Amino acid sequence: MRIFAFDMTFADALIQLRAFARQDGLILSLVWVCSFAAALYIPQSEIGSFLALSTPFVVAWRLMQFRKNALDGIISFRRGLAYSWFTFFYASLLFCLAQYIYFRFLDTGLFRSILSNALQTVSEVYQASGIDTQESRNTIEELITLKPMQLSFLFMMQNIFIGTIMSLPIAAICMRSNSHQQNLI
C-alpha cells in the first residue's frame, strides 16, 4: 500500500519523511562504519576511500527509492533536501556512537599512529615544497590529545556539515514534479 504525499497533512508528511530518513541513515552509517574500519585495518586498500566516496550515491539512491515507493515518483526540491539532510543527520549520530565505542573501548593506539604517519608523509611533502610544517604538527598533536567523546563529536559535526552541503545537489538532481513525470510517459 502506498501512502501518497498529497493525502497527508504537513505533520504526517514530516513524520513519514523522518521515518524513512532514519532507516536510510542506518544504511549510510553502516557504509561509513565499513569505510572507517577499512581505512584503519587495511589502509593500503582503496576500499575505505571507495565507500566514503560512495556516500552521495547511497543517499541519492535511497532518496530515489523513497520518491518511488512512498511518494509515487514525485518529490519537491524542499522535501528532497529535508530527506537528504535528515538522512545525513541520523547517519552522523549513529556513526558518532560507533566511533565513540571504537575510540573508547577498542582503539589501542592505531588511530593515533595513522595520524602520526600521515603527519610524517605530509611533512616530507611540505618540506620539499618549502612550506612550514609547524601548523600541521600542532593540528595533529591537538587531535591526538582529544578524548574519545570529543573526537567522535568532531567527526559528527564534520559529517553533518558536509552532509548539509551534499544535500543541495542530491535534492536538485533527484527532485521530480508531476509535469516532469507526465513528460516521460
Where do the protein language model's features map onto the residues?
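Transmembrane alpha-helical insertion/packing segments
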Residues: 2-67
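Short, charged juxtamembrane terminal tails flanking transmembrane helices
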Residues: 4-14, 174-185
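Alpha-helical transmembrane spans of integral membrane proteins, capturing the lipid-embedded, hydrophobic core
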Residues: 21-33, 53, 84, 88, ...
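Juxtamembrane membrane-interface segments at transmembrane alpha-helix termini
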Residues: 60-71, 91, 123-127
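Membrane-helix interface/capping segments
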Residues: 64-80, 104
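C-terminal halves and exits of single transmembrane alpha-helices
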Residues: 87-113
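Membrane-interface interhelical loops and short interface/amphipathic helices
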Residues: 106-145
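Individual transmembrane alpha-helix segments
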Residues: 139-164
